[in-house]
């Protein structure tokens, strides 16, 4: 299959194909325009993959433009995090990073042009009155008493706004369209508002800032964007997008196309609510591994390729739908099953003493780094008289369905020997502290010579060589599929979204690279935590289990 044949197809790509075939466009120019008021989440990844992917596949260009028109909510921290996320996902923007604030002078000039044409006016209604005058879906709005000011009055008042002559909230610039429009967005929308706040790019040069709907279309036009792609909630805004461009003297007129946003179950996609989780310390930060942010998913152990694959699988349509969390988890599970090296870790250890081995015994057994990829090589793992196994892998009594270690029965230690549990030792609380076993010396990576069948295989770590480690077992942050629908979304937090255990890993993991994925055999996929893990104190995050075991 050629690269072109392997491309995902969707209604947007079909439009682009038609535009190129008809000669409407001879090249493709897209953009990704996030507001730097928070970290990007998995929903933004869909837009990133769409916009940058189209530019890549059609040998076009994609700009990274920050929609930085609200200095009160924005921060350079978010700018830097967004750039990191886009690059980590595997994409490169065309030329320099762009900012809507780069165009503040042009935007101001276009606002003056609209005033000069009698298509914009300075309104002195309060924000509350503007909302009241706007009307509802079933009732038309009514005109502001300031709507019929002369062009000269409006030019003078807008200049007064520009010079700081009005207090915040006492004046704004509005488009003069139609207060009876069936589309509320067209009922004299606000174009400029006053904010006395330093801007992370322009400092204190401006005290008036353009609104999104005014800024977005003009920025697209100034950059020569051919296909302006946004999510469905901006569908009605397309009328204002076109109105602004139709009424100013700008040669380029991009077309806006809308696609469905990503709604992921057991997650929140609102940046306002995600910020609330951070501010109220429900999570440790924007990159908490339970967050649906790109940085959170990365820290948890998700690969960029798995997120890109997820975006391919869910596709691009005009129909809003909810995507199961299992679909995202399936992508990382498939990726890591194929590519993650194997290692052994015991998350809830109990000691096993092999009594028919001499004290101080040490040998090394060969273990493949991947059972299906010999090219990934193998490693030598220490085996000794004392090993740790997982507490869940032993029972004093069990039925035939239990294929692990049982008192008086045998099990195989993976890639090592068959052992038999002979006796146990407990503490005063009745907790098993030690399991005493014997081993069959003739069973190193082979069946017993007498033909007896040993069906169970468990993982282990040599006690003498084990490295202590902390394991952070992450699960879904919310206990219901649609937390946004709850009266108080915080009431749906999953109390078991993080469990921390102490155990051991094999010695090869002492130098584990941060965020490098491993399959801990029989446990799941893990990576060393970027924040907390060090050679002196290993901390591993569980990315996802070996299989989907969630019961909502």
From Swiss-Prot:
A motif ('HIGH' region) lies at residues 34-44. L-glutamine binds at residues 67, 212. ATP binds at residues 35-37, 41-47, 231, 261-262, 269-271. Gene3D superfamilies: Glutamyl-trna Synthetase, Domain 2, Glutamyl-tRNA Synthetase, Domain 3, HUPs, Ribosomal Protein L25, Chain P. Its EC number is 6.1.1.18. Coiled coil: none annotated. One of its GO terms (molecular function) is ATP binding. It catalyses: tRNA(Gln) + L-glutamine + ATP = L-glutaminyl-tRNA(Gln) + AMP + diphosphate. Pfam families: tRNA-synt_1c, tRNA-synt_1c_C, tRNA-synt_1c_C2. Signal peptide: none annotated. Its main location: cytoplasm. It comes from the Bacteria. One of its GO terms (biological process) is glutamyl-tRNA aminoacylation. InterPro entries: aa-tRNA-synth_I_CS, Gln-tRNA-synth, Gln/Glu-tRNA_Ligase, Gln_tRNA_ligase_bac, Glu/Gln-tRNA-synth, Glu/Gln-tRNA-synth_Ib_cat-dom, Glu/Gln-tRNA-synth_Ib_codon-bd, Glu_tRNA_lig_a-bdl. Keywords: Aminoacyl-tRNA synthetase, ATP-binding, Cytoplasm, Ligase, Nucleotide-binding, Protein biosynthesis. GO terms for cellular component: cytosol. It is found in: Cytoplasm. Monomer. Belongs to the class-I aminoacyl-tRNA synthetase family. NCBIfam families: glnS, PRK14703.1. This is Glutamine--tRNA ligase. It comes from Pectobacterium atrosepticum (strain SCRI 1043 / ATCC BAA-672) (Erwinia carotovora subsp. atroseptica). The gene is glnS.
């Amino acid at each position: 299959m050629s690269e072109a044949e392997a491309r995902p197809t969707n209604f947007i790509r079909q439009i682009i194909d038609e535009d190129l075939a008809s000669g409407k466009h001879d090249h493709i120019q897209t953009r990704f325009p996030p507001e730097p008021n928070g970290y990007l989440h998995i929903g933004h990844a869909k837009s990133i993959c769409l916009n940058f992917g189209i530019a890549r596949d059609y040998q076009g260009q994609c700009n990274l433009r920050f929609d930085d028109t609200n200095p009160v909510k924005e921060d350079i921290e978010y700018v830097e995090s967004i750039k990191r996320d886009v690059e980590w996902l595997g994409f490169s923007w065309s030329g320099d990073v762009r900012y809507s604030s780069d165009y503040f002078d042009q935007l101001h000039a276009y606002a003056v042009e609209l005033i000069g044409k009698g298509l914009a006016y300075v309104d002195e209604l309060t924000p509350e009155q503007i909302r009241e005058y706007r009307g509802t879906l079933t009732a038309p709005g009514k005109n502001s008493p300031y709507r019929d000011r002369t062009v000269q009055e409006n030019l003078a008042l807008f200049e007064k706004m520009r010079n700081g002559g009005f207090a915040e909230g006492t004046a704004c610039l509005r488009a003069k369209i139609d207060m009876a429009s069936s589309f509320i967005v067209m009922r004299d929308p606000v174009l400029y508002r006053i904010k006395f706040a330093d801007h992370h790019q322009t400092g204190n040069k401006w005290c008036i800032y353009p609104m999104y709907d005014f800024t977005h279309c003009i920025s697209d036009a100034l950059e020569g964007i051919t296909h302006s792609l946004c999510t469905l909630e901006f569908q009605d805004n397309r009328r204002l997008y076109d109105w602004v461009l139709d009424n100013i003297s700008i040669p380029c007129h991009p077309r806006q196309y809308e696609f469905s946003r990503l709604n992921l179950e057991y997650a929140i996609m609102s940046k306002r609510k995600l910020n609330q989780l951070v501010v109220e310390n429900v999570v440790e930060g924007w990159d908490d591994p339970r967050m649906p942010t790109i940085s959170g998913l990365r820290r948890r152990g998700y690969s960029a390729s798995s997120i890109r694959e997820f975006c391919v699988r869910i596709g691009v349509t005009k129909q809003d739908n909810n995507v199961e969390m299992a679909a995202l988890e399936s992508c990382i599970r498939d990726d890591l099953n194929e590519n993650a090296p194997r290692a052994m870790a015991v998350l809830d250890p109990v000691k096993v003493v092999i009594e028919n081995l001499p004290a101080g015994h040490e040998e090394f057994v060969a273990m493949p780094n991947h059972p299906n990829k010999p090219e990934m090589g193998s490693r030598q793992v220490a085996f000794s008289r004392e090993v740790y196994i997982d507490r869940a892998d032993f029972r004093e009594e069990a039925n035939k369905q239990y294929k692990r270690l049982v008192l008086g029965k045998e099990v195989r230690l993976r890639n090592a020997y068959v052992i038999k549990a002979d006796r146990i030792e407990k503490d005063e609380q009745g907790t098993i502290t030690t399991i005493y076993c014997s081993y069959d010396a003739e069973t190193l990576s082979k069946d017993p010579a007498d033909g007896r069948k040993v069906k169970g295989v468990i993982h282990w770590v040599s006690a003498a060589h084990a490295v202590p480690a902390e394991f952070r077992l992450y699960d879904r942050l919310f206990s219901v599929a649609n937390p946004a629908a709850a009266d108080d979304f915080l009431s749906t937090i999953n109390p078991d979204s993080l469990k921390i255990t102490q155990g051991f890993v094999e010695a090869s993991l002492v130098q584990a690279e941060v965020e490098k994925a491993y399959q801990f055999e029989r446990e799941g996929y893990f990576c060393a935590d970027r924040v907390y893990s060090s050679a002196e104190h290993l901390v591993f995050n569980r990315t996802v289990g070996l299989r989907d075991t969630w019961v909502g």
